[in-house]
Amino acid sequence: HEATHQLNEQVGHTPPDKWVNEGLASYFGASKLEDYNLTPGKIEAKAYPVWWLGKLRPTGDMQKDFASGRVVPLRALISNSGGPDLDTHVNQWYLGYWSLTHFLLHGEKGKYAEGYRKLLAGKSATLADFERDIGPVDVVQKEWYQYLQGLAGDDVAGNVIVVQ
């Protein structure tokens, strides 16, 4: 996670916006390491913030989850404004950063990956940049929420598992 921040700063020069910075760091930090090979996007269920999927799993009622602070709304994640208090809901914010990044790269059969990479090559990742390069926040939010809900499944014993 921290190495990703350093690489972004010194080599990648990605936009400094928090949702991009923390999203990429969480994305790589929660990617699976097998036989000394990191597989970006292959989810390590025991990594932070993924391990919070069990406790903070979306209920299926997007508006209720936003209102309760269970899930941070996409507009708040991107603008770093609104949404639940970061001090008391830090895990919800980081689960949002991670899942949004994972969704933009892998969700909807990769339809947002090109736009996300274009955004990463720019100087900023504001709400206007997001809508220009990726799409309307309200449309993307619905798809991302469904994706986040689908990341957590139940096994026979009722334990939350990461599904892909």
Predicted regions: what they are:
Residues 1-2, 107:
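A short alpha-helix capping/helix-coil boundary motif
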Residues 3-8, 24:
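Active-site His/Glu-centered metal-binding helix of metallohydrolases
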Residues 13-163:
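Acidic/His/Gly-enriched intrinsically disordered linker/tail segments
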